[in-house]
Amino acid sequence: MSKEVNEERAPRTVTDVKEMLTKHSNGEIQRTIQNCITILQNDHVLADAIRLNLLSERIDIVKPVGWPRSGKTLNDTDMKYILRRMEKYGISSEKKIESAIRIVANENRYHPIRDYLNSLKWDGTERIAHVLHHFLGAVEDEYTCEAMKIFLLGAIKRVFQPGCKFETMLCLVGGQGAGKSTFFRLLAVKDEWFSDDLRRLDDDNVYRKLQGHWIIEMSEMIATANAKSIEEIKSFLSKQKETYKVPYETHPADRLRQCVFAGTTNRQDFLPRDRTGNRRFIPVPVDAELAEVHILDNEEDSRAYIDQLWAEAMTIYNSGNYKLAFSPAMQETLQAHQQDFMQEDAQAGMVYAFLEDYTGDRVCSKQLYAEALGNTNIPAEWETRAICEIMNTGISRGDIQGWQAHKTAKRYPKYGVQKGWERVTSPETGAENFSEMSDAEAQQLGFPF
């Protein structure tokens, strides 16, 4: 190796770096941001140390710098050491040094998860179809394979295309000790890329809890979900960005989501009855007794398996031949699985039972509210809307047969002008109690659907 190459690779001394700085006519070093940048880029302690982490959107120190520290993120103590180092060059303006740090970090930005995923080489062995059975004892079938594939590809796309539309949550359902949470923690590769700290969605700091994480487990919220909270979770999952201000910024900025959400529960009825659909939640039952290995039996082997799992998913992602949704046929399978984990719908059962014995040929939501559900008060709009969902969903699914929504509003003896439902083949009796109403009259009134 030549002497010139050796000299180029030798660390620059403080004297060497001083020679690179701009000076006043009297030889004094100028206290400029550019000189600060030159020092940060060439001082042998600080060179290549300061980088902007595009996942956490924080500045990291990525190499040893000669003082005790824990973690990668630049902190106040690090700043004191850097200020002391800069004094060797006669520069002590904290404001200019901080500005230079931000510029240098931005010019040396990196994304740790992208770097990890791009470094993987797939060995050609398929694991996506088997991983949930291998570690958790899930059934090996097309549904389980597609559920895992969609989740993995969604996680990859969120990293390479932050803010992309992905509102699906993979939910693992099984007894305690099955390793569900551990699976998601290891799937995130590094512990700092995983979080299970998202307890509430109405917390002012909820969005900060997403920052720097790739896979976020929502076990507690899923375990205690009810009809209201599940709507909040669905709305939360559908978001593609958060807008907030970090401490060093003057104005709030859009933060595109780079994370995906996972659910774990041992409740067999964790999905509230949702007549508008639970398409965002993909439940997969697991059984630890059927697993080939427990994920922590040999953590090193498990992590190597997961590396290859991501490598396989990256091969699919790079091919571009994928969709982040089930096929129409598989969507039916998903709905069947969701039914297995839904809570009992008491109101729907009462409406169905009422219709079985009802002899009239027409019915409206207010009538069902009073006569099927036994209420005596006037229903709120959301209550009539819920009854409409019961009827319309029941008819579309075939749970309610022989009924259809009538096209125009009709006048009911006890309940006034209402839209409602009529028998497909009406009996000869009962029709005289109702009168047709014109579309114009109906439009002048308000109806729940």
Model-derived features: where do they sit?
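Generic detector of leucine side chains in alpha-helical contexts
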Residues: L21, L40, L46, L52-L55, ...
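Feature primarily recognizes SF3-like P-loop helicase cores of small DNA viruses
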Residues: K88-H111, K165, E192-L198, D202-L237, ...
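N-terminal nucleic-acid engagement/recognition segments and initiation subdomains in replication
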Residues: M1-R127, E142, E146, N377-W382, ...
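P-loop NTPase catalytic core of nucleic-acid-dependent motor ATPases
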Residues: I101-Q211, K366
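Generic detector of short, locally flexible boundary/turn motifs and exposed helical patches
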Residues: M79-L83, N118, H134-A138, G179-R185, ...
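A structural signal for short, well-ordered beta-strand segments
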Residues: N53, P68, L132, F261-G263
